[in-house]
């Protein structure tokens, strides 16, 4: 069965991408209700949507103005498909603009709204069923609807937005000016669920088992009888990709585990034991540490580090592939959060990602990225559904560039060793405290900063290690973890006493945004 035929058997809601950094959160929330959802380009045609056969369509938010010359549009025939449509922020303005209403800069109609506002519901609506008449929502718009199209009526407003929710139930068209996909909209999940279940008629029966079936069909259709290389990093993502690919294509998969000298403590042996031994993956272990470290010598800029490592990874694969003969595909554990941070067709780039854009233009492989529509928590759920043990599935995330982006400034063996040893202590103490499932991600960073200290009767001038620990639901936003003081004290004491060339520990208390999870 092909991917298309499997998809035709699965109810789905399509999200059209108009450029918000958080668009995938819409699809993410809908999938939480047991409904398959994914992003498609706003350039999609009505005919293409007919072939996909969704039960609902969401028009996402975005940074543009609908009346601008370069505004992202929509095939007008989509409004005639008879499929329920929900417009969010820019999406609502687009519906209004295209169907005869009026959108103007917010200064001409009221005030711009950025942050939480109170939504006042003026009429009952299926979309808001089970939610209070007044509720906090996240607004983020510079334009406003001042006249709604014929056939629409007002459902809700805010103090500064005369049309915060509108609908045309006859045509199954709904618009909201706020963002239900973010947690700051207190009843946002209820609103999206009402759209998916009550309005679109979703059964809510999609699961990771469905995803596995679809991806296996897609992989088999793409690969055929050809061969695939997978680069194992030791992290959760590449491990899950390896097990999924083996399930799909068996011995057509060869895994290359590159020891680039930037791994965590004992990482290499653990990877070989877990995936090579327990799961029987065909793994070639390559010691390329000198090759990588020579190239990274004296490199300070994090983007250069990422590009060098991304390029060299592929060159190592190319060398190994030439020995294997006939390898056509390179598999990667790219997640959707990686793509968002690296920018999409409509969204801006925050930083290049180690699995996105770090590859040379003359790469000799086609890419396979089975996880690129998933968030981290979904990858863990996928691993469990594939029968993987919890010690692999709940392994701490590890970036492709390894410790290179956890060492600030030029990379040296001494700095790497401080991070390896301090990170091992951190992970051990977090587990002992029973916090390893509560804290989303945690690791240490060599800040590159030296400071004066006293050990015994002597003066020291050694490195400062930063501890980074965060809580999150999907990795798109995060808060610093409020670790117990006694746990932090024990971690700090152990690192300073057990790790050479370290005399100071600091704790990173920055959320995402404004910071990213990794320091580089």
From Swiss-Prot:
Domain named GMPS ATP-PPase: residues: 206-395
GO molecular function, one term: GMP synthase activity
Statement: the UniProt record of this protein carries the keyword Ribosomal protein: no
EC nos: 6.3.5.2
Entry keyword annotation includes Nucleotide-binding: yes
Pathway: Purine metabolism; GMP biosynthesis; GMP from XMP (L-Gln route): step 1/1
TM annotation in the entry: none
Pfam families xref list: GATase, GMP_synt_C, NAD_synthase
Keywords: ATP-binding, Glutamine amidotransferase, GMP biosynthesis, Ligase, Nucleotide-binding, Purine biosynthesis
Residues annotated as binding ATP: 233-239
Gene Ontology CC: cytosol
Active site per UniProt: 89, 179, 181
Top class in the EC scheme: ligase
Listed CDD domains: GATase1_GMP_Synthase, GMP_synthase_C
Signal peptide: none
Reactions accelerated catalytically: XMP + L-glutamine + ATP + H2O = GMP + L-glutamate + AMP + diphosphate + 2 H(+)
Residues annotated as domain Glutamine amidotransferase type-1: 12-205
InterPro entries the record matches: Class_I_gatase-like (IPR029062), GATASE (IPR017926), GMP_synth_C (IPR001674), GMP_synth_GATase (IPR004739), GMP_synthase (IPR022955), GMPS_ATP_PPase_dom (IPR025777), NAD/GMP_synthase (IPR022310), Rossmann-like_a/b/a_fold (IPR014729)
Subunit structure: Homodimer.
Function per UniProt: Catalyzes the synthesis of GMP from XMP.
NCBIfam families: guaA_Cterm, guaA_Nterm, PRK00074.1
This protein's name: GMP synthase [glutamine-hydrolyzing]
Native source organism of the sequence: Streptococcus pyogenes serotype M6 (strain ATCC BAA-946 / MGAS10394)
């Amino acid at each position: 069965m092909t991917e298309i035929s499997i998809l035709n058997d699965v109810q789905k809601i399509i999200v059209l991408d108009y450029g918000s950094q958080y668009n995938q959160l819409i699809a993410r929330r809908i999938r939480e209700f047991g409904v398959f959802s994914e992003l498609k380009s706003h350039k999609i045609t009505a005919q293409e949507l007919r072939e996909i056969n969704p039960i609902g369509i969401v028009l996402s938010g975005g940074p543009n103005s609908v009346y601008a010359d370069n505004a992202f549009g929509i095939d007008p025939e989509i409004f005639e498909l008879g499929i329920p449509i929900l417009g969010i922020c820019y999406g609502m303005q687009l519906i209004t603009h295209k169907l005869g209403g009026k959108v103007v800069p917010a200064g001409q109609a009221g005030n711009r709204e950025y942050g939480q506002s109170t939504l006042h519901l003026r009429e009952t609506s299926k979309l808001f069923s089970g939610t209070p008449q007044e509720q906090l929502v996240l607004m983020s718009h510079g334009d406003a609807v001042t006249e709604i199209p014929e056939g629409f009526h007002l459902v809700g407003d805010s103090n500064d937005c005369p049309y915060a929710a509108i609908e045309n139930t006859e045509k199954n068209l709904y618009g909201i000016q706020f963002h239900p996909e973010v947690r700051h909209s207190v009843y946002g999940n209820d609103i999206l669920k009402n759209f998916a279940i009550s309005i679109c008629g979703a059964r809510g029966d999609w699961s990771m088992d469905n995803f596995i079936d679809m991806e296996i069909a897609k992989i088999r259709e793409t690969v055929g009888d050809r061969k695939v290389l997978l680069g194992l990093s030791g992290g959760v993502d590449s491990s899950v990709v390896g097990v999924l690919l083996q399930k799909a294509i068996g011995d057509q998969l060869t895994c290359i585990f590159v020891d680039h000298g930037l791994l965590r403590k004992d990482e290499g042996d653990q990877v070989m034991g877990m995936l090579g031994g327990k799961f029987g993956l065909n793994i070639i272990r390559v010691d390329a540490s000198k090759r990588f470290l020579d190239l990274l010598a004296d490199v300070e800029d994090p983007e250069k580090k990422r590009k060098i490592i991304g390029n060299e990874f592929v060159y190592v694969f190319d060398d190994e592939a030439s020995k294997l003969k006939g390898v056509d595909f390179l598999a990667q554990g790219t997640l959707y959060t990686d793509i968002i941070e690296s920018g999409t067709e409509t969204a801006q780039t925050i930083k290049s990602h180690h699995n996105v854009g770090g590859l040379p233009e003359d790469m000799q492989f086609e890419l396979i990225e089975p996880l690129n529509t998933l968030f981290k928590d979904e990858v863990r759920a996928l691993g469990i559904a594939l029968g993987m043990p919890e010690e692999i599935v709940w392994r701490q995330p590890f970036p492709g560039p390894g410790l290179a982006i956890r060492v600030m400034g030029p990379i040296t063996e001494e700095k790497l060793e401080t991070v390896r040893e301090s990170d091992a202590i951190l992970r051990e103490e977090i587990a002992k405290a029973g916090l390893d499932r509560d804290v989303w991600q945690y690791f240490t960073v060599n800040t590159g900063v030296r400071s004066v200290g006293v050990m015994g009767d002597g003066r020291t001038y050694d490195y400062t290690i930063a501890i980074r620990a965060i809580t999150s639901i999907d990795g798109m936003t995060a808060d610093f973890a409020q670790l117990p003081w006694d746990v932090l004290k024990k971690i700090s004491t152990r690192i300073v006493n057990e790790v050479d060339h370290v005399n100071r520990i600091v704790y990173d208390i920055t959320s995402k945004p404004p910071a990213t999870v990794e320091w580089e």
